[in-house]
């Protein structure tokens, strides 16, 4: 199998790193997972690299497990970034259609997207994505696919996602030190949404909450395109730290308690259920309801931050597709019930779509971003093959929505 048919998704998180190897032939509709690996993160804080050598060692561990499992020596990786001071702003590109017959070509589409990137990033920031939201031809708005249409002026409204330049530079250094060639960098919650949302959800208007260890990614889709993205500064590890202080146990014990006895909804937890902390380094026996109360408070804070972000962009209680929960932090029981109460939206738990593989990987929310990175990578390969000028493909992002 040629190297072009193999892509690795590398999700570099604060608490863990997931790597997925997938292959796709011309006859396959969806990529097939052929290898995977996971490692405990080191040298990371709030989604950003703070120790390059430590981060590189952890990245190398997950990557090596994945390629050994897949039986390959190496391949390019689509790599996630989940922190580093993310900033989102709207932009616009306007061009005059170049052909004499005024038929819009791929080149015109490329020029419009590049024009939207012409506004430089804020100081100390770097443009990570420039995503098309809406096209306009001669004043006619709401066009999804301008290719082949006739007009004089082509406009595109885009969403530009910027990241701290130092955070990107440090991540690139860590991945390179791990011996991995980066194919592309992608915002982690964007990759997760790419895996868990179907076209109908994107069209209806849907929120994705990618709950990680120290951050929670937020992405909104509406009318088929991305509407907003953000990274919130709280994650499931904050609930673990709350358990450390509340129960007087160490971090490892608190994490184990959260995973084995945790719940995000105290009212549905029986007061008769008890946990013997002596087996976990504690000194007494407590009610399981106490653990649920601590966890619920922290996850409610995460949902409160998400609700404030929805209000800020005018989408609170206005998403017919509801909210989709994913990420390793979403594993805690009854989180969907709490989210429904706090967000006033229908809630579903997201699993990866458009990719096949073992259920323990494809249906594990902790692997959603890594799987989304693989899907993104194969879609970009398709874009590159269909572009008239392949060298410009990196600026196109999701041009698959506009090119048949």
Question: Locations of the language-model features?
Answer:
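Nucleotide/phosphate-binding catalytic cleft detector across ATP-hydrolyzing
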Residues: 1-16, 20-208, 225-227, 236, ...
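Glycine-rich beta-strand-to-loop/alpha-helix junction loops that act as flexible
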Residues: 79-84, 321-331
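Short glycine/threonine-rich loop-to-helix capping motif typified by GTGT followed
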Residues: 198-200, 328-342
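A general structural motif
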Residues: 211, 298-307
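A structural feature that tracks compact, well-ordered secondary-structure segments
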Residues: 217-219
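A cytosolic small-molecule/anion-sensing beta-strand core signal
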Residues: 222
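Hydrophobic, well-ordered secondary-structure elements that form the walls
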Residues: 306, 325, 373
């Amino acid at each position: 199998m040629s190297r072009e048919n193999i892509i690795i998704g590398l999700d570099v998180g604060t608490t863990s790193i997931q790597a997925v190897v997938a292959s796709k032939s011309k006859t396959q509709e969806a990529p097939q997972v052929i290898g995977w690996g996971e490692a405990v993160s080191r040298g990371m804080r709030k989604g950003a690299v703070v120790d390059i050598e430590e981060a590189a060692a952890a990245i190398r561990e997950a990557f090596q497990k994945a390629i050994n499992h897949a039986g390959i020596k190496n391949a390019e990786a689509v790599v996630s970034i989940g922190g580093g001071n993310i900033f989102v702003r709207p932009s616009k590109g306007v061009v005059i259609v170049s052909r004499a017959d005024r038929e819009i070509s791929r080149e015109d589409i490329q020029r419009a997207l590049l024009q939207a990137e012409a506004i430089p990033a804020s100081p100390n920031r770097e443009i990570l994505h420039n995503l098309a939201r809406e096209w306009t031809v001669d004043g006619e708005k709401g066009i999804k696919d301008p290719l082949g249409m006739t007009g004089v002026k082509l406009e595109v409204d885009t969403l530009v996602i910027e990241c701290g330049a130092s955070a990107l530079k440090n991540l690139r250094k860590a991945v390179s030190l791990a011996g991995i060639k980066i194919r592309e960098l992608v915002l982690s919650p964007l990759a997760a949404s790419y895996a868990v949302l179907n076209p109908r959800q994107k069209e209806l208007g849907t929120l994705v909450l990618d709950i990680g260890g120290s951050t929670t990614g937020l992405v909104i889709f509406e009318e088929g395109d991305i509407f907003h993205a953000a990274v919130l500064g709280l994650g499931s590890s904050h609930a673990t730290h709350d358990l450390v202080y509340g129960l007087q146990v160490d971090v490892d014990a608190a994490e184990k308690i959260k995973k084995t006895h945790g719940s995000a909804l105290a009212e549905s937890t029986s007061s008769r259920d008890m946990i013997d902390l002596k087996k976990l380094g504690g000194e007494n026996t407590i009610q399981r309801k106490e653990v649920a109360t601590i966890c619920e408070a922290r996850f409610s804070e995460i949902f409160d931050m998400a609700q404030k972000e929805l209000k800020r962009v005018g989408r609170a209680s206005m998403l017919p597709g509801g909210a989709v929960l994913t990420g390793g932090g979403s594993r805690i029981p009854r989180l969907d019930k709490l989210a429904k109460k706090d967000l006033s939206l229908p809630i579903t738990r997201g699993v990866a779509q458009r990719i096949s593989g073992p259920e323990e990987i494809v249906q594990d929310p902790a692997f959603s971003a890594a799987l989304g990175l693989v899907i993104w990578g194969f879609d970009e390969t398709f874009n590159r093959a269909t572009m008239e000028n392949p060298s410009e493909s990196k600026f196109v992002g999701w041009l698959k929505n506009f090119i048949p």
